[in-house]
Amino acid sequence: MREGFEIVAVNYWKSVNNEIKRILLDFWNTFLLIHDSLDFADIVGFLNKMPNPGKIMYISLTKSNDSMKPHLKDLKSKIFIIDCVSSMIFETKASQDCQFEPTPASLNEMMELIEKYILVVKPDLIVIDSFSQFIDFSSVSMHKGKELHEFLDELKKKYARTPYRFLLLYDNVLSKDLVNLPFTSVDVILKYEILTRRKDRMDRF
């Protein structure tokens, strides 16, 4: 959250393509979360709302491990971070709960990164932060659209019958009109909006 602001409300909009019973029983495989915050604390808040997320493998393309660390104490689940930011800036050293990798340049490279770690980490939930590094849902070219659907189809083909679940974060901080959402390629699409106001603002009512 931006300094000097406080949360006043959290809104949800949901598009569910499979049966609602499946969603309530948490039998989804791919979940697209559209949010308007770059604050990791807000992401932690959402993860804590998920029933039984299990062990999390968090692939970060936008936040360094050091920037996320202060908020991990609030996370209820065990987490393994794959930091794709820090190695571009300074020398890094892996730890028991964090590994450093170059930033994937495409969704194909993202798939390779997932496959590299999924059997080692053995997570229940794989989080990709942020999907907006690969695609802009307000304007999708034919090439990008093809790459997106191939990636999502491959996720389903390989992991639909496994315990692994995928949470795809998409930050829409510019509040663009997202007219090209992959409604038929993911199980759930949820828009997560955090409303804020200045803490020093005086109510005039």
What label would you give each PLM region?
Residues 54-135:
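Conserved inter-motif catalytic segment of the P-loop NTP-binding fold
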